[in-house]
């Protein structure tokens, strides 16, 4: 079944991305899956795509806010600055909030935005240590320039037992799908219904979107 993830909530001209308003607007438009960006700054988990200025931090939505609808949603969480130095404090803070909100872990997809596979491997180990081996981990891929890049990614996913991949949708074609047939793809950011249908025909089932609402989707 296809999942449409509201990309940073369902923003509009007057409703900013990664805001409580964009979360609620996503719900109103029928989304039951959401993608959002998280920063760990000043010991706080706050939401914004680009790194916020110090003066912004207290005015932004926080991590807890985005679980307002509890287990009605699936959550694709893009951790923007999760690294080896802050991982323990960040992940413990995340666990505390998820426990308090009683969120089912099988509805959470952890997607640290780390394209250095050596660092990503270390972070995935830390996440599994805290949340268990069954936690949904998403690797991230922005580009694949050469066949060697493809093989490196393939080896990384296999070695680390990663079943999910977040990837720019224009990279995906039939050849790509053949090479990663055992991997569940999370495509971003798909705003054209024709392109979504093309990807569906290739077997892709998870999409981040700014424009396509669930009512327009016919499974």
Task: Locate predicted features.
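Phosphate-group recognition and catalysis centered on beta-loop-alpha active-site segments
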Residues: 1-219
